[in-house]
């Protein structure tokens, strides 16, 4: 097992250091420039669209709303990356990793806008809802069905299996620390709950997510704000520590900046998923009048995940000063940091929070995989087999080592993201045109912009739902 963990780590170093970071930052800055800084200029519109329920499709009761699509994507984004991932990034990359998490969120949000807008543009009619995502725009937009199948397999493995094993691993570690519950028992409980909900389909997942997500996110944010207020005199010093470790001479000479950069981007990507090709799978299911609406909604999801929730965790850890001791890593470091601020109840609070955070991620991750199973095959047996396999991986994650679980997730994430970034760079011109169409309608006084496929006659035959 140690040899396998080391091998996976070596492959990850090559992918994440020499390929993925360059591609992520390159795409982020390119899309930011081409969209005229859409992620900064249209924040007000993003918030307004959360209440948008106007679709143009008959039988809308079978489709999900903009807010439900937002909730499912946040359910997947807001998971172990926000508590355990931030702790790991700070432990391995130092406080400077937090700065690079902010950078990848601020600029990478433009990639999230492009991929989700394209997913809406190329969505198709499913059985009870729209379906779409990178596999569909690779097939219909790029005319490369083989690429869509490759991406679908990568996503199924990454989200359905690898990421869900990480979520399960973190939940079990937190409950073992807080309540001394064995990972095997907790794994059985998680597996049973997962079976019950995922066999209810996208509507049940949407309902559960739209309830869990606001409660868990707001509860954690309020606790973090309380801790920040308690430590407000230390806040300038913590921010200075983050900036100094991101750019300081001492860190540059010691190679610390490179480690901070790599950890910040790696954990930031795992947390907010910008450019990864995951959120577009649920963005495509929303019933909206214009593809840009879901692009903006999913951009807001990136900001919510990293700039708000990940930052809360980072401040809690850095206020405690425990990151520099090396006594703990991952979720246990976050638990120890909260204990330092609010007493022994901190361990229990984090265990409960991670249960909601990570379990909602399991549900969101499951749906991403299901959408791609349906892309690969329409055989009726495929979905039940996939559902059982997901539950098997939830159980596997409960018993696996932390390093192996994270390593598998990282390598799968890297290959999948590279595949998606290539596609959205090639198809980005259509998202730019859609954004311009949306802006023109808004400037002309239209409060609710509407898109029809005759506005893009050159690709009209590929746009099934418009």
Where are the model-predicted features located?
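Flexible loop linkers connecting adjacent transmembrane helices
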Residues: 37-64, 88-98, 102, 110-142, ...
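Helix-loop-helix module between adjacent transmembrane segments
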Residues: 27-32, 104-128, 134-169, 173-198, ...
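Transmembrane helix-loop junctions in multi-pass membrane proteins
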Residues: 3-4, 34-39, 81-86, 95, ...
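N-terminal alpha-helical transmembrane segments of multi-pass membrane transport
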Residues: 1-80, 91-96, 425-466
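Membrane-interface loop-to-helix entry segments
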Residues: 23-30, 35-47, 169-175, 181-231, ...
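Extracellular/periplasmic helix-exit of transmembrane alpha-helices
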Residues: 113-122, 127, 223-241, 255, ...
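Alpha-helical membrane segments and immediately flanking helix-loop junctions
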Residues: 57-90, 118-121, 127-135, 139, ...
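Extracellular loop-to-transmembrane helix junctions
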Residues: 9-48, 91-128, 304-310, 411-421
């Amino acid at each position: 097992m140690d040899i396998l963990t080391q091998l996976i780590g070596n492959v990850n170093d090559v992918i994440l250091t020499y390929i993925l970071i360059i591609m992520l930052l390159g795409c982020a800055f390119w899309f930011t420039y081409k969209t005229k800084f859409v992620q900064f200029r249209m924040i007000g519109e993003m918030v307004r669209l959360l209440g948008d329920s106007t679709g143009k499709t008959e039988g809308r009761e079978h489709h999900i709303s903009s807010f439900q699509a937002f909730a499912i994507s946040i359910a997947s984004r807001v998971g172990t990356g926000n508590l355990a991932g931030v702790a790991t990034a700070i432990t391995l990359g130092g406080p400077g990793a937090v700065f690079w998490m902010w950078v990848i969120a601020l600029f990478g949000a433009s990639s999230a806008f492009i991929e989700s807008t394209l997913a809406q543009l190329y969505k198709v009619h499913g059985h009870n809802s729209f379906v779409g995502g990178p596999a569909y725009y690779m097939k219909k937009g790029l005319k490369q069905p083989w690429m869509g199948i490759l991406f679908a397999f990568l996503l199924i493995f990454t989200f359905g299996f690898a990421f869900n094993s990480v979520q399960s691993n973190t939940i079990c570690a937190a409950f073992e620390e807080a309540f001394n519950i064995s990972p095997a028992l907790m794994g059985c409980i998680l597996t049973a709950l997962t079976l019950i909900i995922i066999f209810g389909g996208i509507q049940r997942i949407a309902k559960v997510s739209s309830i869990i997500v606001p409660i868990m996110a707001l509860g954690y944010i309020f606790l973090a704000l309380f801790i920040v207020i308690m430590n407000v005199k230390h806040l300038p010093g913590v921010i200075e520590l983050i900036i100094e470790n991101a750019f300081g001479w001492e860190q540059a000479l010691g190679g610390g900046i490179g480690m901070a950069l790599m950890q910040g981007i790696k954990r930031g990507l795992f947390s907010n998923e910008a450019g990864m090709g995951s959120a577009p799978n649920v963005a495509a299911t929303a019933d909206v009048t214009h593809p840009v609406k879901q692009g903006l909604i999913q951009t807001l999801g990136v900001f919510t995940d990293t700039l708000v929730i990940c930052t809360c965790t980072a401040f809690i850890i850095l206020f405690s000063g425990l990151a520099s001791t090396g006594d703990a890593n991952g979720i246990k470091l976050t638990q120890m940091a909260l204990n330092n601020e609010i007493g022994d109840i901190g361990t229990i609070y984090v265990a409960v929070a991670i249960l909601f955070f990570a379990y909602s991620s399991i549900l969101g991750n499951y749906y991403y995989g299901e959408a791609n199973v349906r892309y690969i095959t329409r055989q009726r047996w495929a979905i039940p087999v996939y559902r059982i396999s997901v539950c098997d991986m939830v159980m596997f994650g409960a018993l696996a080592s932390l390093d192996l679980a994270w390593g598998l997730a990282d390598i799968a994430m890297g290959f999948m993201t590279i595949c998606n970034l290539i596609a959205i760079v090639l198809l980005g011109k259509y998202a730019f045109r859609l954004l311009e169409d949306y802006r023109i309608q808004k400037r002309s006084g239209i409060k609710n912009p509407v898109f029809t496929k005759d506005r893009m006659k050159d690709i009209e035959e590929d746009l099934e739902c418009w």
